[in-house]
Amino acid sequence: MTLPPLSHLDRLEAESIHILREVAAEFRVPVMLYSVGKDSSVLLHLLLKAFAPSRPPIPLLHIDTRWKFREMIAFRDRRAAETGVDLRVHINPDGVMQDVGPISHGAAVHTDIMKTQGLKQALEHGGFDAAIGGARRDEEKSRAKERVFSFRTARHRWDPKNQRPELWNLYNARTGPGESVRVFPLSNWTELDIWLYIYREKIPVVPLYFAAPRPVVERDGAWIMVDDARLPLHPGETPQLRSVRFRTLGCYPLTGAIDSNADTLEAVIAEMLVNTSSERQGRMIDHAPGASMEQKKLEGYF
């Protein structure tokens, strides 16, 4: 009997599920990073599919910086309750003691302490030897050259010159003393693939991805949403309601929205088909001096 060929999305799905099962089989204490964004939503859906009808053997880990959009935190807790997954949340206690934030300490310091150092703390505290993430190669140039199984040193640093060859769908999971692995099952997906899969599978995502009237101010050429009273307004600055949406989500003072009327999945996909700019154009931290994605990964960032 001749089976019909798999569609493009079916092939991507099968590859990702294979990688997730490989992680569960090869590592002692794996964990999945859950940032609450669209890629994390797809990863969670794939994780549930990979081990259905059982509960996934891999817990979720969220690094909370205390500056995420309120809708993100509400969505995170709701999805954890709906799916029954084991969700663990970590906030860097040192950052809390110093009251570190993007306004008071700047984007680079905030990202390093609350994200990078917080992630390293959580991985060490949990004894995790593999951390699954939703990074894709089409997002950014340093991620384009990263392996699916990305080996990290005992200090969680990424050495791009010291990685294993990956032939076809064969992955070497053998680690040296102190090493750990970051695993990226969505490596070969594109932003458009993600949205098409969300549409096909009816995957819930944070409403911030859809256009709606939101209070924003213009900062450095980007629309920054006034999500709560912690965002100080500049002299003469007044929030204005604009129809905006977000292509990527992070800490709200560091995440720029785009003008858009795409308030449905179909409209978002149609917008994607004609958009030529990077989805990370709204990540203000990417434009800070010395804050390139590769530099952050060398320091232990995901």
UniProtKB/Swiss-Prot annotation:
The keyword Manganese does not apply. Pfam families: PAPS_reduct. The keyword Nucleotide-binding applies. Transmembrane segments: none annotated. It comes from the Bacteria. InterPro entries: PAPS_reduct_dom, Rossmann-like_a/b/a_fold, SO4_adenylTrfase_ssu, Sulfate_adenylyltrnsfr_sub2. GO terms for molecular function: ATP binding; sulfate adenylyltransferase (ATP) activity. With CysN forms the ATP sulfurylase (ATPS) that catalyzes the adenylation of sulfate producing adenosine 5'-phosphosulfate (APS) and diphosphate, the first enzymatic step in sulfur assimilation pathway. APS synthesis involves the formation of a high-energy phosphoric-sulfuric acid anhydride bond driven by GTP hydrolysis by CysN coupled to ATP hydrolysis by CysD. Belongs to the PAPS reductase family. CysD subfamily. This is Sulfate adenylyltransferase subunit 2. It comes from Xanthomonas axonopodis pv. citri (strain 306). The gene is cysD.
